[in-house]
From Swiss-Prot:
Pfam family membership, one: SSB
Biological process, per Gene Ontology: DNA replication
Region (Disordered): 97-126
PANTHER family linked to this entry: SINGLE-STRANDED DNA-BINDING PROTEIN
SSB domain sequence ranges: 1-100
Keyword Transcription among record annotations: no
GO cellular component terms, semicolon-separated: nucleoid
Recorded GO MF terms: single-stranded DNA binding
Self-association and partners: Homotetramer.
Keyword match DNA repair: no
Bias-annotated ranges (Basic and acidic residues): 105-117
Organism: Chlamydia muridarum (strain MoPn / Nigg)
Domain of life: Bacteria
Name the UniProt record assigns to this protein: Single-stranded DNA-binding protein
Lineage, uppermost ranks: Bacteria, Pseudomonadati, Chlamydiota, Chlamydiia, Chlamydiales
Amino acid sequence: MLFGYLVGFLAADPEERMTSGGKRVVVLRLGVKSRVGSKDETVWCRCNIWNNRYDKMIPYLKKGSSVIVAGELSVESYMGRDGSPQASISVSVDTLKFNSGSSRPESRGSDEGRQRSNDNVSLGFEGESLDTEIALDKEVYAGFGEDQQYASEDVPF
């Protein structure tokens, strides 16, 4: 099982669907910023919220909302419009949180307001907390550019 945390912005309002078996699923399209060298890229992920989980949060999720998603990751393949093979990332959502920190300047409040709103941010596991204040003054990226160094024994392949 591959489990991960994603921080990003919703590309559209949540979409409610029903499977052929009658199960309810709410689909979020999440754009996650990443940086490769000096080039910024957005990775698009489909996040599936099954049954009635997070029903009280879903009405507050809108296009542009910044969220933190944790769950089981999978890679799915499909044929593109031009007939070439494509891949997409899908997440079966286990934890969903509003991200009070945002890299969008228009959505930032005062430093004092941001600090108060970050006091109770958690990752969804007992005893673990997320210190978002450190990341608030940086762009929300999977990595912070080329200054990350890895020893060869750290790379799993």
